[in-house]
Amino acid sequence: MKTSIVTLLITFCFYLSVYAQAPQDKATELKEQALSSLKQKDYIKARYLFKKAYEAFAVRENYPQAIECGIQANALYVRENFYKEGFELCRNMEQLIWTGEQKQNKVFYDLRFPISKERLQMYISLKNPAQAKNQLDKLEEIASLAKNDSLMEVLLYTNCFLY
């Protein structure tokens, strides 16, 4: 009787630990499936999975992974000329970053930068030089505030691409 209770208790604890890890694994699994779909050139499925992975990482407050997946989904929106959805996703990502900054009392320049860069790419694709210039100025401001050499390097390459 005692061994069956102990066995039942151990099994219960094991299932609890597996269940607790499931949401993180689900987000990672979605990201891996999205990468696989992208590799197979199934862009619609990849976009859907990247967006779901973005949402799953956002719920877990894993901001770097969420933004990475959001940027991938946005690039696939732009690839299909879904600019309205792309701009909406950028707004959602910026809102997520703002919420995270408020919770952690620090500014995530390294996460704001790729969102602004993605928005710049959309304005370039839309042939809107005024808004592209505004986004470039915003990128320069973010890079200077971040004091991060890798962001400055990306900014230089982005400037070269623009001109």
Model-predicted segments: where are they?
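A "functional boundary" signal
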Residues: 19-163
